[in-house]
Amino acid sequence: MERRDFLSKLGMATVTYTLVSGKVFGESDHFHFEKIEVPSPLVGEDLFQYIQRQKGSFDVTLYRQLLGAANEFKEGDEIAGISAASDEDRLKARMLLAETTLDNIRKHSVFTDEQSEFIEQSTRSFQETESGKAIGKLRMREFKELLLLANDAEIKTLLPYLTSDIIACVVKLMSNQELIDISSKIFHPLPGTQMGSKGYMSARVQPNSPTDNIEDIVWQVFDAWSYSVGDLVLGNNPVSSNPESVAKIEMALYDLLTTFKLENTLSHSVLAHIDIQAEVEKTYNGQTGMWFQSIAGTVKANQTFDVTIEKLKKYAAQRKGKFGLYAETGQGADETNGHGEGFDMLIHESRKYGLWRGLKQQLNEESWVHLNDVAGFIGPEVFRTKEQLVRCCLEDLVMGKLHGLMIGLDICTTLHMDVSLDDLDWCIDQIMPANPGYLMALPTKNDPMLSYLTTSFSDHLRIREKFGYKINDAMWAFFKQMEIIDENNKPSAHFGDPVWMYYQYLKLKGDTRSMDEIYSEGLACIERVRERGVPIARGYGVKHWDMNPDLEQEIRLLYADAKKCLWEETPSDFKKSLTQ
C-alpha cells in the first residue's frame, strides 16, 4: 500500500458507535475510530434531559460525545471517537444543544482541573448578578440569535458572564456566515492604537532563520517595512533556546526599533519559552518586548509546554509596562500531545482563550495582550481540507473575540495537507470578511525555518486592496516618513526595496557613506541571506501586491519539489537490498 493510500484509509476508517446501547455495528478492516450516532430527541428536549432519559443520570462520557457530535467534521474529533456518524446525527446533537440553557452548560463541566476552575473564577462575580442570572436562563439558540442581532457594545455587556465552554458551544451552532457576521462586529483594539479595530488588519513580521542568523532576521524586517508591512510585532521563532542566543535576537530586534524610534509604536518578541525570556529580561531590563508562551486547554497539556497556572500568573504580575503578553494556540494541539481527555478540540481551544483572558485581567488596562491562533500547523490528523481550515479560523476568531481578546490568525498549512498555495489564497479570501486582528507576514508564503506555508507580504497588500483594510495609523505615518508610501498614500519609487530601508537605517546610525556604497553593500547582504535559504522579496509584478515574478516562480518550483519528495516511494530495489 502506498503512503498516500495508507493515510487516506487512516482518515476514512471508522467504527460507528450507538449512544443508546454502546454497541458497535460497523467496522472497518484497518482502524477503529468510534463515530457517534444520535437517536432522535424528543421535541424540546435538551442535552441533560436526553442524557437522563438514556442513562438514568448524568453521564459525562455521553455528554462529551454529544458535544463532539455537534461540531463540524474534523479528523481530530473523529480520531478521538467523538465525531458525528452523519450530518443527520450532527443535526440531532445540535438540536439538543440548542435547547440547553447557558447556566446548565456552565454547571456541567466536560472536564475539571485547575485551569477550568481558573476560567470559572474569572466570570463568577458577574454570574451572581441579576443580569448574569437572566443571561444564564437563555437557551443556546436564543443566545445565538442575541449575538446575531446585538451590536458591539451590547455584546460586550454579555462577555463577563461567558465561560469558555459556553462560548465553544454557541459556536458549534453557527454557520460560517453567522461566524463572519459576529466576528465582523466585535473588536478589542490594543490600547492607544487602531490595531484590532474594525477596518484594520495588522501584521506580525515573522523573520525566522534556520540558523538564528542575525543578518537573516534583520533583513526580513527591512524587507517587510519596504512593503509597508509590519505594524504589530516583530516576532521571531528561534531555533535555539540558549539564553545567550535568544538575547542576541532580542537585542537585534530592539536595535531596529530604537534606531527608527519605534520602540513605543510596535513591539518585538522572541518566541522562546517564557522562562528563557524572563531570564534574558534580568540582564536586559525592559528590552525583551512582548513575553510569549504557547498555551493549551488543560493543566496536563500545559505541562507539555512546561507551564503551570501559577507560573503564568507570576509572569503576568511582572508585566507592568505597555507590552504585556502574547500567546499562540491552535485546535488539535492538546489531542496530538496525548491530552485530549475525551472532549473535543473546539472546547479545548476555547479554554486556552479562557486562560489568556484570566491572565489579561491581572495586567493593567494599558498593557497590550493578544493571541495568535495557528490554524493548520499540525496537519491532516487534525483536519485536512481547505474548507476545514476556513471553518477552524472562523470558529476561533469568534471564540477569541467573545473572550474579549485581540486575536490574530496564522492561516497556514503543512506540506502533507491537501491545501495548495492557490488554495491558501482561497482560504484567505473566505476568512477576511471576519476581520481578524492580524496575520503573519513573511517575504513569501514559505517559512524558511518552520517549513510550513502561511501569509506573505504580498498577501497583506492584496488583502488591503481587496477588502479595504488599513494598518495602525502610527506605522502608516512611519512608512510615509521613510518614503515607502508617498503623499497620496500610494506606493513610492522605493516601495518593495529593502535596500532603501537598510540605507535609512545606516543613515540614522550616522553612516556618512554615499548611497551607491551602501546600496552595493546592501545587495551583497541580500545575496548572502538568500544563499542561506532565506527568501528576500524585492520589487513586484504588474500590481504592487503581485510578488516579483521570478521569486513567485522559484517558490512554486520549491513547493512542487517538496510535495514530490514528501510522497515519493522508496525504490523497490532499495527495499530489496535491505533484506540481503
For each feature predicted by the language model, list its residue ranges.
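Catalytic alpha/beta core domains of metabolic enzymes, predominantly
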Residues: 281-428, 434, 440-442
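Active-site mouth loops of central-metabolism enzymes
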Residues: 202-216, 414-420
